[in-house]
Amino acid sequence: MAYIREMVSEDLPAVTWLEEKSFTVPWSEDLILDALESPLDRMWVLVEDEYIAGYCNFRVIAGEGELMRIAVAPEARGQGYGRKLMEHLEKDAGDHQVEDITLEVRASNEAAIGLYKSRGFQVEAVRKRYYTHPVEDAFIMWRRRS
């Protein structure tokens, strides 16, 4: 059974691998470590059978939350792990009185956009040609509770 726990430094190789498999411009191990050590960031891993199948990075600044990264291993997609990670960060946000959460997503990432919409997020802006490799627009999505 899958469970979620706080990320620890020993998870860096697995999370770096998830980054490389999930993003065209992955974060380096150093960037991930910086986030892990930041007092503004919360990071969790989703573990299935002692294997890290997903992770997310949630940042809180001035009372607002931002989903910085979320990734699920390619072979573990379609099992609801992204939803479980989102539910976990939403509960954490509520526990810390964070009502509004934002994120950015590639305009072509239909699976992620569908997940975010199912969690109450709406597209509020578009950043034209924001992403590289390939060049693509970003949707800025918000879930506002305030």
Task: Identify what each model region corresponds to.
Residues L67, I101-V105:
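Conserved hydrophobic beta-strand within the GNAT/NAT acetyltransferase core sheet
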Residues V72, R106-A107:
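Short amphipathic helical patch at the helix-1/turn junction of helix-turn-helix
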Residues M141:
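Divalent-cation-assisted or electrostatically stabilized phosphate/pyrophosphate-binding catalytic cores
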